């Protein structure tokens, strides 16, 4: 992979201490998107990684997964599918709940967005626990999609989400890694 592009991307991601709560060092990808060279480098690296792999759909999770998944889908010439929180999608949906640190959350996808045999790549900004992508994987598979790959801009490997997703049979790719939570 292009180390110059990775360095540019990593340097553009601001770290915000004690957000959203004390003890968390938040990695802010919105600062990456403020830098057009870093944003383009991110999309270019994703395209270089996944072009020619035969994906028929790109799925992005709410909300920052949209910001990387949609441009990737355009570059690969495939459809983009948003996975959203309940009540945000207008057509018939299927839902999947998942556990959070304190409680549960739910994601939805249009039932007609994935057809049997679609080869799907999931994209999100950051991999921490893997709960969001695990729920997304279940939604795609429930609709008959084939999902074996998940791509992230950032991985926080100490939290263990990559291992969790590998346990679901997913190949996990991230552009850069950061220590901590």
From Swiss-Prot:
It catalyses: AMP + diphosphate = 5-phospho-alpha-D-ribose 1-diphosphate + adenine. It is found in: Cytoplasm. One of its GO terms (biological process) is AMP salvage. CDD domains: PRTases_typeI. It holds the Pfam family Pribosyltran. InterPro entries: Ade_phspho_trans (IPR005764), PRibTrfase_dom (IPR000836), PRTase-like (IPR029057), UPRTase/APRTase (IPR050054). Its EC number is 2.4.2.7. The keyword Oxidoreductase does not apply. Pathway: Purine metabolism; AMP biosynthesis via salvage pathway; AMP from adenine: step 1/1. Its main location: cytoplasm. The keyword Endoplasmic reticulum does not apply. GO terms for cellular component: cytoplasm. NCBIfam families: apt (TIGR01090), PRK02304.1-1 (NF002632), PRK02304.1-3 (NF002634), PRK02304.1-5 (NF002636). Homodimer. Belongs to the purine/pyrimidine phosphoribosyltransferase family. This is Adenine phosphoribosyltransferase. It comes from Vibrio atlanticus (strain LGP32) (Vibrio splendidus (strain Mel32)). The lineage of its organism: Bacteria, Pseudomonadati, Pseudomonadota, Gammaproteobacteria, Vibrionales.
């Amino acid at each position: 992979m292009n180390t110059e592009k990775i360095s540019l991307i990593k340097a553009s991601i601001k770290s915000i201490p004690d957000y959203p709560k004390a003890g968390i060092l938040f990695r802010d990808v919105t600062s990456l998107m403020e830098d057009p060279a870093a944003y383009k480098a991110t999309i270019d690296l994703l395209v270089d990684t996944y072009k020619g792999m035969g994906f028929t759909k790109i799925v992005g999770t709410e909300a920052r997964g949209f910001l990387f998944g949609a441009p990737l889908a355009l570059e690969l010439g495939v459809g983009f599918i948003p996975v959203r929180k309940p009540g945000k999608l207008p057509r018939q949906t299927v839902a999947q709940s998942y556990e959070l640190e304190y409680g549960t959350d739910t994601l939805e996808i249009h039932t007609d967005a994935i057809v049997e045999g679609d080869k799907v790549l999931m994209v999100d900004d950051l991999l921490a626990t893997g709960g969001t992508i695990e729920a997304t994987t279940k939604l795609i598979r429930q609709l008959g999609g084939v999902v074996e790959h998940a791509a992230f801009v950032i991985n926080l490997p100490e939290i263990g989400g990559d291992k969790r997703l590998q346990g679901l049979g997913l190949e996990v790719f991230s552009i850069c890694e950061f220590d901590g939570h």
